[in-house]
């Protein structure tokens, strides 16, 4: 399943799920919206691996859906060819001058004007009169032709087949002008033509790249496209659209210019515009034709496409136009089609806007596209930036001033942090997983993050029930002050399909044995539940009001979902001070119900699944300064850890397991119930801050120290200190 989140505005947010040949849309409250599929539209999303082969991007009410395996093509229907035709334009009339039209080698029209010996002969030299006389001859001498005169213009069309033609006059070619097939200059065109008549303007004789076509539209000569060409896209092979329609539902359709009706109002679907001017030389097909589209993105008010070794941008402001609007001149808003120049084959997989630039990813290299103030064919260039291998299963994600992308490390995976060094202005990509190379399992298929919450999530195909979490904190100069990797591990039967982030919430799509769920996780630190001074920590947490049965003296809570794991009931913030935040002793009555003795039906309670928190300390070492900014661990000698102190804040419960090598584990528990504390009330949760001290008495490499908690109460740790005895039998000589 391919998952995509649409964040239209604060009031409208939708989760899109694309299956093999099907598409569904839900609100974040779980309400399914109606999706109307245009005829044949779902053929585009027929694929056995939607997760890998589909990609989506949303702008306003339109979500572009691309199938990375679909080869784009042109429509096989060519435009209608014009019949063989010509226009004869009587440009000048002079006394005693002969005007001739020759067709297929035979003179079919001949007229000689009178001399100027008589003033009445002036009517003989008018251009309209000459055209009339020539037309009379044409009508007398030709059959199988359509002949129309309009003033000094004569239009001739052969009803079937082709013909050759030439003209003669006594004025050196300046009296009778022929327009057939092509003409040298736009200035040679008559003041008017025949509606639909088309001709090629050849321009310079040494090149075909300045040729263009014009036709008479009934009022003026306008630029047009050569007839008989395949100018349109095969819309069934182009990116499709998921449109949020005026009634609040959705329509999935190719961008084919079709129309649909809602109520009594008709709406038009956008259309990938075909070639409207020029020919295959002056206005060639975009380079994505005949290949697959790997990525689609927005940059500088253009819709960009990565295909093969090219990046193609639409006409500025026209996301469905990939042809020139005129071939007579170059315009700043023209489409742009540019290819790589590299000594390796560089198939472009992704385009990511980055610090006003565009970062382009191939399998082994990264390229920077940085135009001037405007993106035009004249100003654009692509330069190689770095060479890092990437895993193209997951699209890189930009967070703040960094871009994160995955790479393979044998049967494991890593994530690089791409940035511009503030010291050297060089582009670098540090390995965030260098100190734990075997932590993330292979094949990262999704990377999502939040710059506001300084967090990145990585999803792996090898561990579908895990969320790998990278947390980071940078100073004002983009220096990393803190970094960490951790993971959220769900039930072994859970399959995480994807996640997306809106503001401070991560929305997770999870497939379970009983269906697909959309669940959300609050990423904001120090959040508390209503009327509580902490957030109740339960998985799949929901607020439920219990039902009390006086006959059995039991309160029953019914979950909105089935659950077989151990669940808890915690009284919410609407309860009195002595009750709120308390966890009840409950009976797991069924997979959807919990019961507790007593009446707890007056206010809602939080119901959810218990989960385990675990943090294992790395080994403690003595460290010595190597440079002004770095330290190194000292492995020589013996370090005997005597004790440690854990500094915590706003914490209600945790346990610490200390396991010396070859000895049993000792557990030390903190419950928040501290005698003499002003917040201590028996049976009521209490959040405390302070230092928790515990003995170690073990060699640093022979002990494992783990913090854990399965409570609904929070635990927050600020730092840890240890002290011990370090002895060394050798001495370093310098």
Residue ranges and their predicted role:
Residues 1-9, 413-734:
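Beta-sheet repeat architectures centered on beta-propellers
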Residues 269-301, 307-454, 462-466, 470-498, ...:
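Beta-propeller and closely related beta-pinwheel folds
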Residues 37-54, 270-294, 340-349, 589-594, ...:
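Short linear interaction motifs
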Residues 51-72, 358-361, 367-368:
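Elongated alpha-helical scaffolds
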Residues 15-18, 65, 304-305, 358-361, ...:
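Conserved beta-strand element within WD40/beta-propeller blades
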Residues 53-55, 62, 68, 82-91, ...:
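Long, charge-dense tracts
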Residues 1-32, 188-347, 410-426, 657-662, ...:
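N-terminal beta-propeller domains
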Residues 71-86, 373-380, 385-390, 611-630:
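A short, polar beta-strand/turn micro-motif
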């Amino acid at each position: 399943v391919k998952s995509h989140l649409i964040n239209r505005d604060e009031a409208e947010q939708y989760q899109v799920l694309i299956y093999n040949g099907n598409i569904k849309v839900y609100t974040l409250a779980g309400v399914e919206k109606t999706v109307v599929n245009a005829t044949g539209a779902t053929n585009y999303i027929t694929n056995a691996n939607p997760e890998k082969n589909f990609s989506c991007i949303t702008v306003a009410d339109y979500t572009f859906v691309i199938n990375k395996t679909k080869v784009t093509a042109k429509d096989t229907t060519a435009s209608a060819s014009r019949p063989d035709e010509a226009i004869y334009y009587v440009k000048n009339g002079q006394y005693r001058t002969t005007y001739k039209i020759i067709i297929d080698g035979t003179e079919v029209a001949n007229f000689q004007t009178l001399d100027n010996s008589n003033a009445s002969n002036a009517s003989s030299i008018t251009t309209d009169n000459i055209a009339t006389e020539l037309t009379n001859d044409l009508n007398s001498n030709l059959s199988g032709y359509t002949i129309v005169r309009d003033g000094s213009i004569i239009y001739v069309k052969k009803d079937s087949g082709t013909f050759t033609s030439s003209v003669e006059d006594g004025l050196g070619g300046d009296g009778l002008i022929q327009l057939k097939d092509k003409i040298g200059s736009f200035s040679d065109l008559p003041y008017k033509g025949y509606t639909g008549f088309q001709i090629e303007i050849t321009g310079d004789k040494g090149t075909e790249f300045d040729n263009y076509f014009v036709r008479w539209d009934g009022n003026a000569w306008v630029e047009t496209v050569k007839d008989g060409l395949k100018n349109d896209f095969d819309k069934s092979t182009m990116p499709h659209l998921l449109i949020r329609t005026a009634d609040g539902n959705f329509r999935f359709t190719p961008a084919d210019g079709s129309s649909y009706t809602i109520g009594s109002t008709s709406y038009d679907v956008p259309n990938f515009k075909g070639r409207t001017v020029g020919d295959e030389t002056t206005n060639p097909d975009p380079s994505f034709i005949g290949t697959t589209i790997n990525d689609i993105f927005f940059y500088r008010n253009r819709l960009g496409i990565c295909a093969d070794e090219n990046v193609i941008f639409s006409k500025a402001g026209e996301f469905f136009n990939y042809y020139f609007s005129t071939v007579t001149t170059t315009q700043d808003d023209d489409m742009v089609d540019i290819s790589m120049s590299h000594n390796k084959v560089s198939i472009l997989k992704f385009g990511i806007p980055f610090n006003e630039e565009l970062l382009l990813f191939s399998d082994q290299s990264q390229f920077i596209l940085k135009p001037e103030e405007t993106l035009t064919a004249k100003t654009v260039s692509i330069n190689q930036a770095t060479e890092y291998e990437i895993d193209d299963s997951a699209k890189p994600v930009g967070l703040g001033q960094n871009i994160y992308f995955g790479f393979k490390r044998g049967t494991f995976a890593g994530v690089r942090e791409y940035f511009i060094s503030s010291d050297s202005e060089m582009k670098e990509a540090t390995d965030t997983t260098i100190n734990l190379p075997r932590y993330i399992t292979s094949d990262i298929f999704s990377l999502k993050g939040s710059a506001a919450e300084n967090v990145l999530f990585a999803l792996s195909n090898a561990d579908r029930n895990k969320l790998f979490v990278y947390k980071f904190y940078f100073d004002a100069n983009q220096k990393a002050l803190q970094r960490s990797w951790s993971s959220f591990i769900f039930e072994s039967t859970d399959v995480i399909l994807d996640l997306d982030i809106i503001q401070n919430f991560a929305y997770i799509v999870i497939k379970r044995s009983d269906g697909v769920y959309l669940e959300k996780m609050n990423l904001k630190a120090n959040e508390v539940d209503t009327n509580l001074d902490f957030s109740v920590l339960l998985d799949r947490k929901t607020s439920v009001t219990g039902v009390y049965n006086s006959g059995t003296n039991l309160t029953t809570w019914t979950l909105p979902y089935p659950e077989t794991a151990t669940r808890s009931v915690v009284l919410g913030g609407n309860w009195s001070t002595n009750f709120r935040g308390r966890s009840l002793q409950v009976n797991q009555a069924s997979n959807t119900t919990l019961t507790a003795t007593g009446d707890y039906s007056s206010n809602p309670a939080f119901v959810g699944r218990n989960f385990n928190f675990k943090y294992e300390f790395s080994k403690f070492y003595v460290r010595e300064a190597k440079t002004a900014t770095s330290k190194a661990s000292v492995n020589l000698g013996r370090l005997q850890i005597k004790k440690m102190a854990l500094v915590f804040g706003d914490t209600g419960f945790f346990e610490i397991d200390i396991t010396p090598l070859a000895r049993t584990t000792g557990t030390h528990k903190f419950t928040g119930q501290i005698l003499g504390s002003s917040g201590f009330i028996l049976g009521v949760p209490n959040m405390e801050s302070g230092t928790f001290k515990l003995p170690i008495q073990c060699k640093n490499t022979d002990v494992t120290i783990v913090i854990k908690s399965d409570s609904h109460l929070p635990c927050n740790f600020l730092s840890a200190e240890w002290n011990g005895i370090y002895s060394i039998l050798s001495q370093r000589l310098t």
